[in-house]
Amino acid sequence: MEHAKLTKNLKLKIKNAQLTKAAGLDKLKQKLAQAGSSDTKNSPVSKAQTKEKSSKKTAGTTASAPEIESGATESTARRIRAKDRSSFAAEEPSTTVALPGDASHLTLDALPSADSTEPLSNSSQEKIVEDAVETPNSPQEDGKELQEEVANEQPARNEETPIIRTRTEPKSVVSIKPKFGPTGKHINHLLAKTFKAPAKETKAAAPAEETTQQTRPSVETASTKQQQPSGTNTRPAQSAPAYRRESTNNNNNSKRGPDRDRTKRSDENVKAFTGRDRYGLNEGSSEEDKWRKKRVHKTKKQSEEHVVQCPSHIKIALPITVKDLAAEMKLKASELIQKLFIHGMTYVVNDVLDSQTVVQYIGLEFGCTIEIDSSEKEKLCLVENTVRDEINETNPQKLVIRSPIVAFMGHVDHGKTTLIDALRQSNMAASEAGAITQHMGAFKCSTPVGEITVLDTPGHEAFSAMRARGAEVCDIVVLVVAGDEGIKEQTVEAIEHAKAANITIVVAINKCDKPNFNEETVYRQLAELNLLPEAWGGSIATINTSAKTGEGLQDLLEMLALQAEVLELKADPSARARGLVIESELHKGLGAVATVLVQNGTLHLGEALVFNDCYGKIKTMHNEHNQLLQSASPSTPVLITGLSAIPKAGDPFIVVKNEKVAKEIISARLAGQQRSAALQKKRPNFDAVLQNKKTLKLIIKADVQGSIEALAHSILNIRSEKVDVEILSSGVGDISESDIRLASASKATVIGFHTSVESHAESLIKSLNVKVCLFDIIYHAVDAIKEIMTGLLDPIAEEKNLGAAEIKATFKSSQLGTIYGCLVTEGTMVRNQKVRIIRDKEVLWKCSLSSLKRLKEDVKEVKKGMECGILLDNYQQAQIGDTLQCYEVIYHPQKL
């Protein structure tokens, strides 16, 4: 039986050996055996220890064949198990166990034949392979085997003892794990510390293989250490895990995660973080802070006061602002303002200084001489002298006699235009609105004594500017005085204009055909004005005339010719033309046209000329008879076209080289005017705001520029302490849509003088509800504007007493309230009038008398001495004995 078992076990061993050889495990055994022998030779372990350990190792094998076979299988399995482990793990002491001698000396001859043995199935082969390649034993099983080997120690056999190589590990360094709080950080890490400079890494990191091999612990060794009983010396003491040693020894060189992996620092190194550290005031206080990046503190450079010296001499052009003057003088504007304020002048930086005296005085205060630069002004001003000065400076050989310019002046309705019509044999007076002249006319008429240029001026008080302009341009003034009325206000004004211009005066006493004509009255009035007539031994020529009968007209012409001969009126026709604008207007077909009077030189067709703020190139030139002219000699009035804009009446003109030069001059002038207008903006009138003045806003449109001037002058002369007049816009031509829209936006009134409304603007007037007033006579326009100004004022309320009644009894009514039984003591109580409730001579309330009854009948009024029932509107607190005064409110319009 035993022999059969042995045979079976032997067969299994042989089969396993064949499988091992087939799998190539025999070569692995040889390599392991050679490695073990080399380690045994190099190891310093003593032979006694080797024998003792080998005896302990072989004690577990039994003498019987099955036990030897199991031991061989076990050793083989261990060698295979060592291969399965990671090659990067720490090596264990390897042991080599030799097979028993009986098994090693077996040969294939002793094996049974193939025929006698039954073939193994696949399942049996798989089972045998599983037995041969066993899984490693658990640590508990290894421990039990070691205990059994120690207990059943047997003497060593004569077999070759295996050599065991052991590895002594250094003692592990015990590291104390710091305790962390709920935040996951140590308490010392939460305190403010001074930071140290990070250590520079000089050594490169170890390869991943070495790190893994060193740090990976032996699971089997650790588990064996836990199961090994204390007091046994069978195995050397195990050291601490590799990863703990690594973290303990190389803590400074290894990179860790958050602060909790850092080593605990001593309290001596902990430094409180203060506000000085935040602002970098503790820099360099310790060596640890040397690594910190020093803040670059910008050192405050002491501002050196650069004493800028004011220049001793500058050259400026006027007007100039305070700011610009300070810049030119290299000073602060505040210094100039302070100096001006000290001398009683209040200015701000944007105010304009246009006085040469003020500018130069301020310069002297700072030690600077200021010179006024007038080069630009000289460039824009083509000529400096007047026409008369230019004629006086001209070579006498070039001068020729010219026609006299005669201006007819006088009071309104004294017959100036009628007298001119009689001289010209025309009928201009019939076409004038209101039978008064409202435009200035200039024309040349031929008389038996020669040609005379006549200027017809308006006589109304509104046209004083026209009269002044006529007095400046004319040579002789014919003062027309009505013999039946004498000298009036505008006559006196005309005399003053003539005296101011030092012009010869000839007095024409008109309307000599009337029965109440009295020339002596006119002589006396002239003498009172220091104009002594020739009849009284003076030098003033007086002529009695009648425009209707023609009496005295020839004498008047002869007198004018005599005066012109005495004056020796001459001009230079070869010079460039200079003159004055008599009137200008906007023609629908021709555009801007102007009536000009040539005073010196000759004006030719196609020449370029410059006015104050516009220029032009003459396209057409007509006389008063609408005849086309090629040239105009001195003392000739002509109507010219081709202007860039409408010139103002009274503007002088002069001929320039070409249109390009004229355009450049006007562009420079307009730029200067715009700059001056921007600098000299009117400050808001705070007095009007404080006085709560009302303002009438107007937009004026007229047929000619002179009419606008006259109307604006008349409107602005309306004096009122309660209403101010502001002219928003004025222009020549018909009233357009833009004028209506501007009036609607600004709540203004449109005034049209001798003009009309464009057809497409009439519907806009109704839709926007704009007030438009059209006039043909100037004094009608002025009167209408006064009425509009008066309508802006709130009427004055006046209370007029009507009667009084005393309350004798009171009656309560649930529907009507309190009814007062009264006795009328004075006057009349009238229904629906105002009532005062008076008690102890004090007015308690004012209300309306809503109901008045007499004997249960509604009456309109109750007279004195009668009783009545009165119901007051919204008042129920009157008592017996109170007095009810009835009154009415009368509104009176205010006066300007």
Swiss-Prot record:
InterPro entries: EF-G-like_DII (IPR053905), EFTu-like_2 (IPR004161), IF2_II (IPR044145), IF2_N (IPR006847), P-loop_NTPase (IPR027417), Small_GTP-bd (IPR005225), T_Tr_GTP-bd_dom (IPR000795), TF_IF2_bacterial-like (IPR000178). Keywords: Cytoplasm, GTP-binding, Initiation factor, Nucleotide-binding, Protein biosynthesis. Its main location: cytoplasm. Residues 156-170, 256-280 have a biased composition (Basic and acidic residues). Residues 510-513 are annotated as: G4. The keyword Protein biosynthesis applies. One of its GO terms (molecular function) is GTPase activity. Residues 401-570 form the tr-type G domain. Residues 35-48, 114-126, 213-237 have a biased composition (Polar residues). Belongs to the TRAFAC class translation factor GTPase superfamily. Classic translation factor GTPase family. IF-2 subfamily. This is Translation initiation factor IF-2. It comes from Chlamydia muridarum (strain MoPn / Nigg). The gene is infB.
